[in-house]
């Protein structure tokens, strides 16, 4: 379980997020959503241990700011929103970096682990390509493969591991969006936990168990998809008169963007 309690972050003397609190459970996909600049990425960086914070962030009972980098690397993998690499690394070299940053439980199977990670993100055959030669979406999937090498198992020694994904599908076509979200969903079903910063509310409704909505650096709403995705919440958080509908087959909510546009 990841417990976020009263978390605040200040950067350059300015408060970016204030008093954020929610719980993410292993076996579930928790989405963080909200308008641009609402504090989603800052919240994720506090959870991952990348930013100093006030309040408390606990992973499996341990306070994040009290854990050493190697301890964090063993229990959580982080996919950043963007990754710029100046040196001409190949895809194989970048993916294998994940093997050196995590526990690497099976060093004798390093090549198989890297190959499986690339296959899971539909990049088999890209091993020898240079990272800079790839499209933005391909680079994003390479970075996810690296994370999957670092956190290759959802449960280690009986304790869940975590994937912290900041906008994991932002550069992807719809087919690969579904591939990556299914991968994240499967990680949860195998006992791990996922927190993902998301913009696509329909993908969020389709794959997430719980959603945390942020606005202006504060928590606006948190709960199940059905509890949070309402017409009233959409108007309060996004300022759009969006209409929430439901898929007839199972009642999954979806956002009808057309409803926010006035046509003559």
From Swiss-Prot:
Record-listed E.C. numbers: 7.6.2.-
Keyword terms, alphabetized: ATP-binding, Cell inner membrane, Cell membrane, Membrane, Nucleotide-binding, Translocase, Transport
Entries under CDD domains matching the protein: ABC_Iron-Siderophores_B12_Hemin
Xref: Pfam families: ABC_tran (PF00005)
Residues covered by the ABC transporter domain: 2-241
GO molecular function: ATP binding; ATP hydrolysis activity
Top enzyme category: translocase
Superkingdom in the source lineage: Bacteria
Topological type in the membrane: Peripheral membrane protein
Record-listed ATP binding positions: 34-41
GO cellular component term, pick one: plasma membrane
Compartments in which it is found: Cell inner membrane
Entry-linked SUPFAM superfamilies: P-loop containing nucleoside triphosphate hydrolases
Record's subunit section: The complex is composed of two ATP-binding proteins (HmuV), two transmembrane proteins (HmuU) and a solute-binding protein (HmuT).
NCBIfam families, per the entry: PRK13548.1 (NF010068)
Family, per entry: Belongs to the ABC transporter superfamily. Heme (hemin) importer (TC 3.A.1.14.5) family.
Main function: Part of the ABC transporter complex HmuTUV involved in hemin import. Responsible for energy coupling to the transport system.
Name of the protein described by the UniProt record: Hemin import ATP-binding protein HmuV
């Amino acid at each position: 379980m990841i417990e976020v309690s009263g978390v605040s972050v200040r950067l350059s003397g300015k408060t970016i997020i204030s008093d954020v609190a929610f719980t993410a459970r292993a076996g579930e996909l928790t989405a963080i959503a909200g308008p641009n600049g609402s504090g989603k990425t800052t919240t994720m960086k506090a959870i991952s241990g990348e930013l100093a914070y006030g309040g408390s962030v606990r992973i499996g009972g341990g306070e994040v700011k009290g854990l050493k980098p190697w301890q964090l690397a063993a229990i959580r993998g982080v996919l950043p929103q963007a990754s710029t690499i100046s040196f001409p690394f190949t895809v194989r070299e970048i993916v294998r970096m994940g093997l050196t940053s995590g526990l690497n439980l099976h060093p004798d199977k390093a090549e198989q682990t890297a190959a499986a990670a690339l296959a899971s993100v539909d990049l088999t055959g890209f091993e020898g390509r240079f990272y800079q030669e790839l499209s933005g979406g391909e680079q994003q999937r390479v970075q996810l493969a690296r994370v999957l090498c670092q956190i290759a198992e959802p449960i280690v020694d009986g304790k869940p591991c975590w994937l912290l994904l900041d906008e994991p599908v932002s550069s992807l076509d719809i087919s690969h969006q579904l591939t990556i979200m299914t991968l994240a969903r499967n990680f949860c079903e195998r006992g791990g936990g996922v927190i993902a910063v998301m913009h696509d509310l329909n993908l969020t409704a389709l794959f997430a168990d719980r959603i945390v909505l942020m606005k202006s650096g504060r928590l606006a709403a948190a709960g199940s998809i059905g509890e949070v995705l309402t017409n009233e919440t959409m108007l309060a958080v996004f300022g759009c008169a969006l209409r929430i509908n439901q898929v007839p087959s199972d009642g999954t909510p979806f956002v009808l963007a057309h409803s926010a546009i006035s046509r003559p």
